[in-house]
Regions:
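Short, conserved loop/turn and helix-capping segments at secondary-structure boundaries
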Residues: 37-41, 64-68, 74, 169-176
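Acidic carboxylate motifs that coordinate Ca2+ or other divalent cations, activating on Asp/Glu
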Residues: 162
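Long, internal low-complexity/basic segments
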Residues: 168-219
């Protein structure tokens, strides 16, 4: 692809983003494919090249990013407003060799394995919702990884002491702030379908003012 861009004269006019939807365990923890909470199943490549921002070419940024940052980044590159419903942040300050005014201090991912267990449990919902407990969420900071399971179990790894994710901690002074951070993240990123839509007396409602197409639609 890169050769084709160079041969066609588009290399200096094309933004390139190389990433993936998941990683691969490749034998780590005795496992393969993508399963569980381990970072090696979720830590993916992220390479972004803006041909206009040569000052940052070749730079390695050691900060947390997530796939939700891709769309805001592309919008910002194209001088388009970032949709209000986007959960991510634009990477454009890093691409210009600058520090953004705000950035996340942790990465998050979730894993849901209900589909693999559908044949195991009888369909006795709503009284016994076994499948609803077959998921997990991870809050990964610079020093720790907190794993919350939907059935109430949890794990907390001290990855500063042991980057291989084999050393657990149960220290409340460590675990409680991580659980609070996990809850805050979930609350801030809950489903926002129709959020910000005001139903008014006698009318169908209106969207918030920062939705780009609102003024064009109402005119």
């Amino acid at each position: 692809v890169w050769d084709a861009l160079e041969e066609s004269g588009q290399w200096e006019n094309t933004v390139i983003i190389v990433t993936a939807d998941h990683a691969e365990l490749l034998g780590d923890h005795g496992l393969k494919e993508k399963v569980g909470y381990w970072e090696t199943s979720q830590h993916i490549v992220s390479i972004v090249r803006d041909p206009r921002k040569t000052q940052a070419h070749g730079t390695v940024v050691r900060a947390f990013t997530e796939n939700v940052d891709i769309m805001p980044t592309l919008c910002d590159m194209l001088d388009q407003p970032v949709p209000a419903q986007c959960d991510g942040l634009p990477l454009t300050p890093y691409l210009a060799g600058e520090e953004p005014p705000f950035w996340r201090d942790a990465a998050h991912w979730e894993y849901d394995w209900r589909s693999t267990l559908i044949p195991v449990y009888p369909h006795d919902t709503p009284w016994k919702r076994h499948l609803d407990s077959m998921s997990l969420a991870v809050h990964r900071s610079d020093t720790h990884a907190y794993v919350q399971f939907a059935d109430g179990d949890w794990l907390c790894f001290d990855i500063e002491a042991d980057p291989t994710w084999r050393t657990l901690t149960t220290d409340p002074a460590v675990v409680l702030p991580l659980t609070q951070a996990m809850l805050q993240w979930r609350m801030k990123n809950t489903n926002r379908t129709l959020s910000g839509f005001l139903v008014e007396d006698g009318g169908t409602g209106r969207w918030p003012t920062d939705v780009a197409w609102r003024s064009a639609t109402s005119e």
